[in-house]
A protein has these predicted regions:
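Short, acidic/polar
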Residues: 17-28, 146-153
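Extreme N-terminal starter segment of soluble prokaryotic enzymes
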Residues: 1-5
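Short polar catalytic/cofactor-binding loops
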Residues: 7-13
Length: 153
C-alpha cells in the first residue's frame, strides 16, 4: 500500500486555501497510486494558531469532516487529517481517517498533550481507535503520543 504524506505549510486559518491544498494533494497522490494521504497534526487552521482553535473548532460531523469525506471520495484516495474538534465546551487535538469512498474509519483525540500551550487549550483524549484499511489493522496517534510505549499495546 502506498501512503503519501503532505509536508508543507499550513493554511494558517485560511480554510478556502486549506481545502484547495487537500484537493490538489489528494488528486496528485491518487494519480501516483497512493491509497492514503496523511496531513499534519492540526493541519486545518495550522498548529501554531491556538487562538483560532479556540474560536473555530468544529464538532464531529461538521463541515470540515463533510468536506474531507467528499474529497476522499472524489479522488478515490483515503485521507487522514489533523483538526481542532469542539465537543460542547472542550476542544480536542483530533485526527480523522476517511477511506477512499469517504467513509470515516477512525477518529482519535490526542492523549499526550505536549507543553503548556497545548495543555492550556486542549482537553486530553482518553481512548484509542483501531480500524482496518485494505486488510491491515491500523490506528491513529498524534505526534507526542508515539513517545509512550503503552499506546502500542
Amino acid at each position: 500500500m502506498i501512503i503519501a504524506a503532505y509536508q508543507g505549510p499550513s493554511p494558517e486559518g485560511d480554510m478556502v486555501q486549506a481545502f484547495r491544498k487537500i484537493n490538489e494533494t489528494l488528486a496528485q497522490a491518487a494519480k501516483q497510486g497512493a491509497k492514503m494521504v496523511v496531513f499534519p497534526e492540526l493541519y486545518l487552521l495550522g498548529y501554531n494558531q491556538m487562538h483560532l482553535h479556540e474560536e473555530l473548532a468544529q464538532p464531529i460531523g461538521g463541515d470540515w469532516e463533510i468536506q474531507c469525506a467528499t474529497l476522499a471520495q472524489k479522488h478515490q484516495c483515503g485521507l487522514t487529517i489533523g483538526w481542532a474538534e469542539r465537543d460542547e465546551k472542550k476542544i480536542y487535538n483530533s485526527a480523522s481517517t476517511f477511506d477512499s469512498s469517504g467513509i470515516k474509519l477512525g477518529h482519535y483525540r490526542k492523549i499526550q498533550l505536549w507543553g503548556p500551550i497545548e495543555k492550556s487549550i486542549f482537553a486530553f483524549g482518553d481512548s484509542y481507535c483501531t480500524f482496518t484499511l485494505d486488510g491491515v489493522k491500523t490506528s491513529i496517534l498524534i505526534c507526542y503520543d508515539v513517545e509512550f510505549a503503552q499506546h502500542c499495546y
